[in-house]
């Protein structure tokens, strides 16, 4: 039986809305499969090649990361993977803290005994802390839709570090500088210019040259009275 994408999308939406709400204890199990199905599934995170199942994976808010699934069909009938989902669980209690968006995909059919793989991108916007990531696959098998839950992976969600060379930050800095420069120019024209004009220093006039001072080094005796000259000569004789 084939399932159309709209039907699968409706099923996934109904599952996310009600499956864990109907059975709170189910959300605490982060390792067991939801159904008994001979279908082995594992996954890795390609951009973290050194992170194993027991290691801590670090991912960042606002950035996409890829989950690469690998699986083997050990049933005696075909199995089709028709959707992906999952959840981030609390590390201590196992309770669901956030669901991955359940999304239908183009069916990946796996015949009995066959293995396969595919990748799915995930984007994050979570409170930065440590979680248990538990991906899920939605399987079409034996005329029914079933859920297969993969293993849990310790995952730490972080905010992206801010860099001074970040283009968005540089643009913001340029806008702020232009804004402050504009405000400073307006303030100067309204208040500053008047203030500086009102307190400008007045230049003092330059002092004129001092009038010449008469000296007694040389005296023209033609205009002196005769008595004065005679008196002067008498003093010299004495």
From Swiss-Prot:
Keyword terms, alphabetized: Endoplasmic reticulum, Membrane, Signal, Transmembrane, Transmembrane helix
> Which ranges form a coiled coil?
none
Tell me what topology the record assigns in the membrane: Single-pass type I membrane protein
Signal peptide limits? 1-21
List localization entries.
Endoplasmic reticulum membrane
Question: Per the record, what ranges lie on the membrane's Lumenal side?
Answer: 22-169
What's the short name of a Pfam family annotated to this entry? TRAP_alpha
- Whether Transmembrane counts among this entry's keywords is yes
Describe the function of this protein: Is probably involved in a pathway contributing to genomic integrity.
What family classification does the UniProt entry report for this protein? Belongs to the IRC22 family.
- The name this protein carries in UniProt is Increased recombination centers protein 22
Which lineage is the organism of this entry classified under, starting from the top rank?
Eukaryota, Fungi, Dikarya, Ascomycota, Saccharomycotina
């Amino acid at each position: 039986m084939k399932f159309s994408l709209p039907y699968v999308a409706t099923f996934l939406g109904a599952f996310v809305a009600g499956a864990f709400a109907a059975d709170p204890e189910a959300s605490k199990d982060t390792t067991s499969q939801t159904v008994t199905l001979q279908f082995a599934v594992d996954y890795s995170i390609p951009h973290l090649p050194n992170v194993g199942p027991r290691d801590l994976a670090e991912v960042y808010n606002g950035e996409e990361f890829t989950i690469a699934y690998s699986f083997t069909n050990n049933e005696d009938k075909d199995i089709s993977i028709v959707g992906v989902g999952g959840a981030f669980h609390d590390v201590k209690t196992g309770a669901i803290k956030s669901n991955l968006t359940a999304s239908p995909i183009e069916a990946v059919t796996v015949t009995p005994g066959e293995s396969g793989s595919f990748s799915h991108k995930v984007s994050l916007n979570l409170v930065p802390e440590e979680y248990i990531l538990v991906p899920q696959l939605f399987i079409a098998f034996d005329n029914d839709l079933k859920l297969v839950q993969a293993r849990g992976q310790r995952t730490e969600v972080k905010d992206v570090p801010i860099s001074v060379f970040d283009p968005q930050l540089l643009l913001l800095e340029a806008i702020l500088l232009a804004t402050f420069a504009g405000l400073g120019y307006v303030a100067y024209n309204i208040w500053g210019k008047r203030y500086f004009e009102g307190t400008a220093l007045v230049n003092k006039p330059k002092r004129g040259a001092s009038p010449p001072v008469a000296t007694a080094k040389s005296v023209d005796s033609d205009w002196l009275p005769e008595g004065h000259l005679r008196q002067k000569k008498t003093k010299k004789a004495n």
